[in-house]
């Protein structure tokens, strides 16, 4: 272990430390939020306001710090970084606001914010690498992630069905644009986790939840179809962008992690709180492969352009 650390440059060590710290921060936030919701009378809106305010303050702090530190960064990249940071906060805010705090299933879905927070973190810390391709992939991710929440809210009006279909259409229309990228877009790695979450989650909901009516199950089928579209898009991009083994390792890791985590989410959460540690272990592994990917792309100086 010491030999491995000695081989790393100061910049690489800082990257690993930041990844570990942010992983701990993300899951402490999730665990504390869940604990407060279950064991206190503090309103959900109060927690939402505090956590949302902290996130937006962090984003503005990072943006202005980077603007003052890296004078060589183009204004267009700073502007795009600001857009991504702001849109990620707004998406986070509205998603959290749409969750019913009395529903166990919906509270569990808060833990799915982890990949979203990873992307949020990396777009704020590497603004010089932001490109149109990353912005488009970020929008696709927001569609993929938010689709888990909104159908349950609008299934009586049919809006959930329309939302799913629009998301599927959006993915197909984005294929041609994304295929023009010359470098590897690491943000698309997070789509793997979103796919397996939605797909296996849909299977569990359809087969085990008796309270979900036929309309709800139909919408979950659309969610699963949407996840499959995302996955096939990822396979297509792998061939075009020539992804390396680390990406396949991350995808495999996501499968194993979610196969273990899903049963805990839906059946054991109320009685057993220790599954969060299992999530944390897999998170460290995900961060390792994710950071190695970022380091390789930066080393080859592709900058996703």
Please describe what each predicted stretch is.
Residues 46-49, 53, 96-127, 167, ...:
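Specific alpha-helical transmembrane segments that line the substrate/conduction pathway
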Residues 1-46, 86, 94, 153-180, ...:
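Glycine-/small-residue-enriched transmembrane alpha-helix faces in small-molecule transporters
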Residues 26-28, 66-105, 228-244:
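Specific transmembrane alpha-helical segments of multi-pass solute transporters/efflux pumps
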Residues 13-21, 44-63, 140, 183-229, ...:
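Hydrophobic alpha-helical transmembrane segments of multi-pass integral membrane proteins
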Residues 16-19, 75-83, 130-141, 160-161, ...:
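Cytoplasmic-side transmembrane-helix entry/capping segments in multi-pass membrane proteins
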Residues 107-113, 178-196, 231-266:
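Helix-helix packing/entry segments at the starts of transmembrane helices
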Residues 36, 47, 98-99, 124-126, ...:
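Hydrophobic/aromatic residues within transmembrane alpha-helices
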